Amino acid sequence: MYSEGHDFIQNNIGKFHKVIIMPSTIRGYSDLFINNIDKFVVFCRENITFDYIKSLNYEPNKNVFITDDMAFYLDLNKYLSLKPVYKKQANCFRTDSESLTGDYKENNHDISLTWNGDYWDNEFLARNSTRCMINFLEEYKVVNTDRLHVAILASLLGKEVNFYPNSYYKNEAVYN
């Protein structure tokens, strides 16, 4: 969970009877989760987070669950442009604090940052961002990345994906 998500929940928790946290990787914020155990239903996308949330006295199949990342539920056919594959490989490595090395590859396209921002609650913009990312990836045979959702989308598109770790366990944990 990013700090923006934490801050949003912290500032709005009083407005809701229950809060459903969709599949996430969560590190820290133990006070938030302990203090709101009666309000939260947490979906984890990997075992490290699942074990962490259980350690805060959440009960499996009651208020903590494990499931796949939401990207796996995407109806890909709604977004395909059916562009032919005509480029060899895309380097889509992080250029932010989650980069493991900060060593950026030649011709790097941190495409997730292109559409990052505060507009993910706008369904139209979110769908178009997803479409643009998929259309970009469609052109390539191979995708090299340390971004989780780029790796998932490229895999769903049938690309050869070389998936690298980020600065903490998220990528490896979701992969496993």
Predicted region positions:
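Active-site anion-handling motifs in enzyme catalytic cores
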Residues: 1-176
